[in-house]
Amino acid sequence: MQALLRLINQWDPLVSADLHVTDGADFEPDISLQVEPVNQGDAQLRASGTQLRDGLIGKLAAQGSLPLPFYPDLARTDDPASGFVLTVYSPRFSTGYFPQRNRFTVLVETHSWKDYATRVRVTRNTIIGMVELVGLHGEQWLRQAHEADSAAAQLGGVEMTLDYRSSWREHTRYGQAESQSDDAHARIIEFRGYAYTRDLSPISGDLMTVYDPKTPQIWRVPFRDRVEPSLVVRASRGGYIVPAEHAETVGTKLTLHGIAFEPMRQPLENAQVEEFRIAHAQFSPEPFEGRQRVALSGEWGRTQRDVPAGALFVPIAQPLSRLIVALFEPQAPDSLVAWGFFNASFEQKEQLEPYVAEQIAKAMFDADPSLQAEFALKLKDDPAFAADPSARLDFFCRRHASYDHRRHLYPVLRTDSAL
């Protein structure tokens, strides 16, 4: 993937294709296409993305295919009666990444249930059709892409959508059920499937779907294609500051993506910045892609900070501003912090042993009688706290001079102005 990113930066393709073979439910359509920008990204590019999608669908249909203009993601795994959900993908997928770069991409999904010759033929037809459409509209689309680049450089301080309501089932918020699109907004479609049965399997003990490809059947099922933002944030007005201790790792990532940044040669004193205080962090129960992911909640707040030399400044005023925000806004689904690059920020470096905390608590009571009253009130009003010895000692540890108040602070800062 890193090698591919280098090629993307070198070539800067206007349109790319991501070729896949998928499995899942069995049905008559032999190929599905999901084109972006259509559901996300620059508004002008969305219109042209729709033109690209519809043009490809028309070409494939004229050649005998039954193409779908969306990836057929079942609302409930292995249950055709549940219908489909239109998924808007995050930037770790090609359909989420290229809109951040103001470029077009086509997710091509043929079907593993079809024979090999069919898969090759429809993939070939798609590639040729894509090239033909670029030949017809490429100059216009390229001009629009460059206009989107210029517009993206002006997005500082603007509210941006970083995630959408969808049903992609890879965990993005650990320990929480994925929210499905509202059935009240679903529409019923007639989908060309096959007859099937769902019987309890003696092997798994679960319902197993078995299709009969010799018996075509029209499925009247809900299609949840209403796309709504689920995470909207205000982009930094000036840019993001990466502290010196993370400069090498993050700088390498930024270079791979073609994002411009500036090493800070001189320290900043009392800089007016924003910092993100993490209220809650939930780690994935197991590693994914070799990393321990984390989902965060919290908020930005203004403060003054000294910034040592060696930090990186990443200006928002550049064509890849959408990608910058996707990487640095901590709640974004594929931000650097979500992928575990700043997990050290959650570690407790210092601690007070219980016997020490007991002595410190008594000394703190003597020094500040109001603290004893506050502690007594919390014991009275919070039964869970009163019954938890660790929480009671932590009450004092957090108020002691040795406590690390930078724990649960996201290390990347925002600034309202260019540095």
Regions flagged by a language model, labelled:
Residues 1-419:
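Structured catalytic-domain cores with a bias toward divalent-metal coordination
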